[in-house]
Amino acid sequence: MKRTALLHAELSQVIAALGHGDMLVIGDAGLPIPDGPRRIDLALTPGIPRVADVLKVVLSEMQVERALIAREAIGQLPVGQLPAWCEGQLAALPETVSHEELKRLSARAKAVIRTGECTPYANIVLYAGVTF
């Protein structure tokens, strides 16, 4: 059995196979998933699992070079403040794009992870970095 936090075999394999610059998307329950990327559906019921929980575990396994979230997720938050579902989890502030652009970009992802999150715009694109 693995010693690290990520026990989901399919997700572990996807992360291990990522190359530099490859995209992995963690999405809320309503994010449309295009036909191209691998679909990893973790949604059990509304709110379970949360994006924050999945993001925490993914970040324990994946070297992330940069991240993107939808501008709409920030809404009226003060400058520099992030939505609760990603607050304190990323090494650097994520870039922002429109929700429509994030959906377009997700078509190029290696995989899209669907969570049970029901918070609007709780979606994040992670770009794989290198460990050297």
Swiss-Prot record:
One of its GO terms (biological process) is D-ribose catabolic process. Pathway: Carbohydrate metabolism; D-ribose degradation; D-ribose 5-phosphate from beta-D-ribopyranose: step 1/2. It holds the Pfam family RbsD_FucU. It comes from the Bacteria. Keywords: Carbohydrate metabolism, Cytoplasm, Isomerase. Homodecamer. NCBIfam families: PRK11797.1. This is D-ribose pyranase. It comes from Variovorax paradoxus (strain S110). The gene is rbsD.
